[in-house]
A protein has these predicted regions:
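Active-site hotspot residues in diverse enzymes, especially metal/ion-binding acidic/histidine motifs
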Residues: 1-323
Length: 323
């Protein structure tokens, strides 16, 4: 169960306030507020109301102590320079987001089912084969693009969430875990929809693949690329062996398949459609000419869809505490 203290800590971290800063606003020392957050003392309604004002939430938000999901956080990915204090803040944001999602599912009377399981994968060919099998499961032909990956995963009971960019989430790369036996993927909101889309595909691979190999990351990269850009689709578009490829061909393929220029070139090289020197030349040209992909962005929609429907049905009166 979540506690009042857990909520106080979460809301303080959301506001990016230290114990000293928050405590000084209500006449608490840092140790005094820490006792409140650790539920070591009885909570005064007067103090809780003042803290609610500081944190820009309601008293009901602070008093809401529904069940909390058990999260291991073993697959939290952050940059090497991210401090332990910031990691704890990111964990609190993830915990709150996941708890809210499962609460919305419960209030909506929706039951998710894990349809995927795990797969023992030890070679690049096996990783590519798994991506092909998943496309068959999704009923997407091997030579057609996946137009909206996040929507597709949400339609198959995978929870996908995003964290807004802020000083708190700076350095957050992503998170993936089976929670309550449901696959959960969380990524930062990106300016670039291409890297976000690739990371969602890669983290899906991390959830599905069990490997004896030390370089599992290489297998999940292969899985992600193969899911988004099957080798057959490349051969259909570019042919089996090319001495030269114009950048405009790459650009057109990127617009259709929504994959970055560099990942298309990487896949062309891996598939032996172009040589390493051709790949190097194309990448140099893209960097030199500062070529940019056509803008697009995918959004996770199920969370807000449930939230605003429950609000319209008067089951949830205040949506702000869930945002």
């Amino acid at each position: 169960m979540k506690s009042i203290g857990d909520n106080l800590k979460l809301f303080r971290l959301r506001c990016n306030l230290s114990l000293t800063d928050a405590g000084s606003k209500v006449g608490f020392s840092a140790p005094g507020l820490l006792k409140y957050e650790r539920n070591k003392v009885n909570h005064s309604l007067d103090k809780l109301n003042k803290l609610a004002d500081i944190y820009n939430v309601t008293l009901d938000d602070i008093l809401r102590v529904d069940d909390t999901a058990s999260i291991k956080f073993t697959n939290l990915r952050v940059g090497t320079s991210v401090s332990e204090a910031k990691i704890e803040k990111i964990k609190s944001l993830i915990q709150n987001k996941v708890d809210n999602y499962f609460e919305l599912l419960n209030k909506s009377n929706i039951k998710l089912v894990n349809k995927f399981g795990v797969h023992i994968i030890n070679t690049v060919n096996e990783a590519e084969s798994l991506a092909t099998k998943l496309r068959i499961f999704f009923q997407i032909p091997i030579n057609e693009p996946i137009y909206n990956l996040i929507y597709l995963l949400e339609q198959h009971d995978i929870i996908v969430l995003t964290l807004d960019k802020s000083s708190v989430t700076e350095g957050f790369i992503g998170f993936y875990e089976n929670i309550n036996n449901i696959p959960v993927i969380i990524v930062p909101k990106e300016d670039d929809g291409y890297s976000q889309r690739f990371n969602v595909a890669k983290f899906l691979g991390e959830l599905l693949i069990i490997s004896n190999e030390s370089n599992k990351s290489n297998l999940t990269d292969t899985f992600a690329l193969s899911l988004l850009v099957p080798t057959k689709s490349l051969i259909n578009e570019f042919g089996e062996n090319r001495k030269k490829i114009n950048f405009e061909e790459i650009d057109i393929f990127s617009k259709v398949y929504r994959v970055s220029y560099k990942n298309i070139i990487k896949k062309l090289e891996i598939s032996n459609i172009i040589t390493s020197s051709n790949a190097k030349y194309l990448n140099i040209y893209i960097n030199k000419e500062n070529k940019k992909e056509q803008y697009f962005m995918e959004e996770a929609l199920n969370y807000n869809k449930m939230l605003y429907k429950l609000n319209a049905l008067d089951i949830i009166s205040d949506v702000s505490s869930y945002l």
